[in-house]
Swiss-Prot record:
The keyword Lipid biosynthesis applies. Keywords: Cytoplasm, Fatty acid biosynthesis, Fatty acid metabolism, Lipid biosynthesis, Lipid metabolism, Phosphopantetheine, Phosphoprotein. It comes from Desulforapulum autotrophicum (strain ATCC 43914 / DSM 3382 / VKM B-1955 / HRM2) (Desulfobacterium autotrophicum). The gene is acpP. This is Acyl carrier protein. 4'-phosphopantetheine is transferred from CoA to a specific serine of apo-ACP by AcpS. This modification is essential for activity because fatty acids are bound in thioester linkage to the sulfhydryl of the prosthetic group.
Length: 77
């Protein structure tokens, strides 16, 4: 599974009411997909576990869109 597909799957699984078809690269995690602060923490933790990486808090705050998360993970893995 590609990084993009895996990130999209994690987001769709963790955010209730979000279909994987809605998880497009340009989508804002908060504004478009409805993630609140707790959901964002859960997303980061799930991505860290799935990709066996550590995501710094400063870097996590910069993940505004789905694509931000995908690109960050591509660089780290």
């Amino acid at each position: 599974m590609s990084v993009e597909a895996k990130v999209k799957k994690i987001i769709a699984e963790k955010l209730q009411g979000v279909d994987i078809e809605d998880v497009i690269p340009e989508a804002s995690l908060v504004d478009d997909l409805g993630a609140d602060s707790l959901a964002l923490v859960e997303l980061i933790m799930s991505m860290e576990e799935a990709f066996d990486i550590d995501i710094d808090d400063d870097d996590a705050e910069k993940m505004i869109t789905v694509n931000d998360a995908i690109e960050y993970i591509r660089k780290k893995s």
